[in-house]
């Protein structure tokens, strides 16, 4: 197994419902270590740049509106095969299709308000971590 870093974002719906601690518990119980974490409000510009790969998709504007509707918690996670492990503990994008015991099944409200975003590949993880964090903010 390989030690990896991955990016995670707790979304506004979970923040508004005071679920940060619960989300972190899922992540830590899965064996992931939170090595950086900060809360902020994303600007529309930041959100549009972050989700740039979806710019041509019909849901892009609503995604930017949603992700800027409240605070988010940005995280760097570390662990063995962290990217796959994080994707597994998050569950399917649609909470209705996610397995029981996953963050999205247990805490998500809809496809958009599904409580959490996580990197889907090593390239995405690198880009997303570097988008929000300086190396000095990541505690080993």
Curated annotation (Swiss-Prot):
Binding positions for ATP per the UniProt entry: 11, 59, 87, 93, 104, 114
State whether keyword Transferase applies.
yes
Which UniProt keywords are present, listed alphabetically? ATP-binding, Cytoplasm, Kinase, Magnesium, Metal-binding, Nucleotide metabolism, Nucleotide-binding, Phosphoprotein, Transferase
Q: Where in the cell is it found?
A: Cytoplasm
Primary location group: cytoplasm
Q: Which SUPFAM superfamilies match?
A: Nucleoside diphosphate kinase, NDK
Q: A GO term (biological process) for this protein?
A: CTP biosynthetic process
| Pfam families assigned | NDK (PF00334)
InterPro entries per UniProt: NDK-like_dom (IPR034907), NDK-like_dom_sf (IPR036850), Nucleoside_diP_kinase (IPR001564), Nucleoside_diP_kinase_AS (IPR023005)
Q: Which reaction does it catalyse?
A: a 2'-deoxyribonucleoside 5'-diphosphate + ATP = a 2'-deoxyribonucleoside 5'-triphosphate + ADP; a ribonucleoside 5'-diphosphate + ATP = a ribonucleoside 5'-triphosphate + ADP
**Active-site residues?**
117
Q: Name one GO cellular component term.
A: cytoplasm
Family, as annotated: Belongs to the NDK family.
Q: What does this protein do?
A: Major role in the synthesis of nucleoside triphosphates other than ATP. The ATP gamma phosphate is transferred to the NDP beta phosphate via a ping-pong mechanism, using a phosphorylated active-site intermediate.
What quaternary structure, including any partners, is listed in this protein's UniProt entry? Homotetramer.
What is this protein called in UniProt?
Nucleoside diphosphate kinase
The taxonomy runs: Bacteria, Pseudomonadati, Pseudomonadota, Alphaproteobacteria, Rickettsiales
């Amino acid at each position: 197994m390989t030690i990896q870093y991955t990016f995670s974002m707790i979304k506004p719906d979970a923040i508004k419902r005071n679920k940060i601690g619960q989300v972190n518990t899922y992540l830590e119980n899965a064996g992931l270590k939170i090595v950086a974490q900060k809360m902020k409000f994303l600007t529309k510009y930041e959100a549009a740049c972050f989700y740039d790969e979806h710019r041509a998709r019909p849901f892009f504007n609503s995604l930017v509106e949603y992700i800027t509707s409240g605070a988010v918690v940005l995280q760097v996670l570390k662990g063995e095969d962290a990217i796959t492990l994080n994707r597994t503990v998050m569950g399917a994008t649609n909470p209705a299709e996610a397995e029981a015991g996953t963050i999205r099944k247990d805490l998500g409200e809809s496809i958009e308000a599904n409580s959490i975003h996580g990197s889907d590949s090593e390239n995405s993880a690198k880009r997303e971590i570097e988008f929000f964090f300086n190396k000095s903010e990541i505690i080993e």
